[in-house]
């Protein structure tokens, strides 16, 4: 086992680590510690309003904006979930993640979906992620060719005040939620990014 001297070394390292973490919290740079207390009222209302309406959900994002969601889907959805019909899925949509600019992947996703029966959620913390913008551009054009009112089929999760996606969101009138600016990508799954999906 470990003797007291060895434990003292680790205790000191733990104290130093905790001290650094508390300093980040005091400087409002570690927003992830506040995520359990976030207000989810608007998100829950939105999710309830959309429930049962769409056969497909396309999540557009990369890195921290998609990896947590993919992990949740793999952990919580049964194997072969997307192959099941709407009733077998409990009136929940199939989940597709557009997380890179591979044209074959985007094409395959869109070939599986119908524009009027698909909801799109675009996620980028900065609002200016190039891969996300490229994918959303393709998906937006696909929606625009298939339906009259695209804004009813798109929501965004992005920076509250800056970035290209924020400007587009405000101009087009998309439903929008804010990524907490002080929450890093690796923790975003615990924020609106993961909870809404």
Q: What is each PLM-predicted segment?
A:
Residues 48-197:
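Glycine-rich phosphate-binding loops that contact phosphosugars or nucleotide phosphates
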Residues 1-51:
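Extended, charge-enriched "interface" segments that sit outside catalytic cores
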